[in-house]
Amino acid sequence: MEPLVAELKQKIEDTLCPFGFEVYPFQVAWYNALLPPAFHLPLPGPTLAFLVLSTPAMFDQALKPFLQSHHLQPLTDPVDQCVAYHLGRVRESLPELQIEVIADYEVHPNRRPKILAQTAAHVAGAAYYYQRQDVESDPWGTQHIAGVCIHPRFGGWFAIRGVVLLRGTEVPNLPPTKPVDCVPTRADRISLLERFNFHWRDWTYRDAVTPQERYSEEQKAYFSTPPAQRLALLGLLQPSEEPSSPSQELHITTLLSKKPQNPRRGWLSPTVSPPISPGP
């Protein structure tokens, strides 16, 4: 790795890693090479970028402390706000650089994603992006099959949070890092893609490899709740709002305590199709 890249990576890691994030460098050219022009990042090919993902530890190391602080005004989505806060700290830690942060959920006015997060994760070597084209003679006929990223250490128990673009910082000699192909057989790839596309609510696709760490039951309950109901789940409704279900009456102290998750929490029924990307 080039000395400049190693130095910047270390600075970003010092800012993010204590809070359950990982960072991976890549060149914009590697990303653009895999996509049609409409999805290209409008930067010179050698521009340095970093892929940022969250590990299972982020929930305890970043989100809970964030909720205990005074950063939540006004309330929208606690996880997105927490991630935005920490990515903003990256910009503050490197004031001499031109830094642009693109979150995984950002879109252009025409609703086209600003970043295809799974492609970025693949070219950065963070996680292998398994797609239908990776299965020889696939069995799905005319069915639409979405792809999914698998991390070599966390399986599917992680989330891609965004990219950090360093405008004006070019690293033409940065060598590419291939992602680890941790689901190498045809049968296992078929199983992975079917679990993700048809049974994604049961979490099993995330165990495509034996993970070092999984989401806690507390995290699973949070991420299984519709976004519109998550504030109520955390006890963060405005005083004038009323919870619409018993599961929404749980106070934030439940989330912030070290006690086991309340077993009465409900679960969503499976929906027809998986999310566009394998979050959260």
Curated annotation (Swiss-Prot):
CDD domains attached to this UniProt entry: MMACHC-like
Catalytic activity annotation: 2 cob(II)alamin-[cyanocobalamin reductase] + 2 hydrogen cyanide + NADP(+) = 2 cyanocob(III)alamin + 2 apo-[cyanocobalamin reductase] + NADPH + H(+); apo-[alkylcobalamin reductase] + an R-cob(III)alamin + glutathione = cob(I)alamin-[alkylcobalamin reductase] + an S-substituted glutathione + H(+); apo-[alkylcobalamin reductase] + methylcob(III)alamin + glutathione = S-methyl glutathione + cob(I)alamin-[alkylcobalamin reductase] + H(+); apo-[alkylcobalamin reductase] + adenosylcob(III)alamin + glutathione = S-adenosylglutathione + cob(I)alamin-[alkylcobalamin reductase] + H(+)
E.C. number: 2.5.1.151, 1.16.1.6
Pfam family, one: MMACHC
One GO process term, biological-process aspect: glutathione metabolic process
Record's GO cellular component terms: cytoplasm; cytosol
A single GO molecular function term of this UniProt record: demethylase activity
Coiled coil ranges: none
Localization of this protein: Cytoplasm, Cytosol
Cofactor(s) needed for function: FAD; FMN
Entry-annotated residues carrying Phosphoserine: S245, S247, S273, S277
Cofactor note: Can utilize both FAD and FMN.
Residues noted as binding substrate in the record, renumbered to the chain: D104, I115, L116, A117, Q118, Y129, Y130, Q131, C149, I160
InterPro entries per record: MMACHC (IPR032037)
Top-level division of the source organism's lineage: Eukaryota
Region feature Disordered, mapped onto this chain: 256-280
Keywords (A to Z) from UniProt: Cobalamin, Cobalt, Cytoplasm, FAD, Flavoprotein, FMN, NADP, Oxidoreductase, Phosphoprotein, Transferase
Family affiliation: Belongs to the MMACHC family.
Functional summary from the UniProt entry: Cobalamin (vitamin B12) cytosolic chaperone that catalyzes the reductive decyanation of cyanocob(III)alamin (cyanocobalamin, CNCbl) to yield cob(II)alamin and cyanide, using FAD or FMN as cofactors and NADPH as cosubstrate. Cyanocobalamin constitutes the inactive form of vitamin B12 introduced from the diet, and is converted into the active cofactors methylcobalamin (MeCbl) involved in methionine biosynthesis, and 5'-deoxyadenosylcobalamin (AdoCbl) involved in the TCA cycle.
Subunit structure: Monomer in the absence of bound substrate. Homodimer; dimerization is triggered by binding to FMN or adenosylcobalamin. Interacts with LMBRD1 and ABCD4; the interaction ensures the transport of cobalamin from the lysosome to the cytoplasm. Forms a multiprotein complex with MMADHC, MTR and MTRR; the interaction with MTR could modulate MMACHC-dependent processing of cobalamin. Heterodimer with MMADHC; the interaction might play a role in the regulation of the balance between AdoCbl and MeCbl synthesis.
Protein's recorded name: Cyanocobalamin reductase / alkylcobalamin dealkylase
Gene: MMACHC
